[in-house]
Amino acid sequence: MLDVKKIRLYLFDMDGTIYLGDNLFPFTKELLKTIRETGNHYLFMTNNSSKSVSDYVKKLARLGIEAAEDDFITSSQATADYLKKNLAGKKLFVSGTRSFLSELAENGVENIHDSYSEDIEAVVTGFDTELTFAKLEAMSKLLTRDIPFIAANPDLVCPTEYGYVPDCGSVCAMITNATGKKPYYIGRSEE
């Protein structure tokens, strides 16, 4: 049996776990306060790459939760680490929000482009709430070549206050259906 007295670090998902949209769940503040008061720690984890860590710090502050940038582990950060280690120097087409592109750049990823070019060497996508048909078309066209296809996370949907919306995995499913290419997923799986 799990002895909660031995737990020192708690990991919390965010979307649909501690809040939904801009609505904090009633138990969240008290739970986090109790964890801190008992001398333990917590980190926030998310596959949602549509926001940067600084966006999340601001969002939690608006919801009444104090957090520092070091309190987060995101699929954007993990994607940046992967790209730096495996595709350094490659010219990347990135489909994602402005925050996703900024997060990659702030984490040391270089040569990021958000428009089609013949010399692109890899395709990267995240949860793109600013998705356009032009981005879908560019990814499909680029992936007719034998280049890497990297995705921030496999989530098919993201919970919101009004239901679910298509997430990174759904966009990847469209691209896979169009090209036959499957992405290499970085973020944690839904399993």
Which residues does each predicted region cover?
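HAD-like aspartate-dependent phosphatase fold
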Residues: 1-14, 18-191
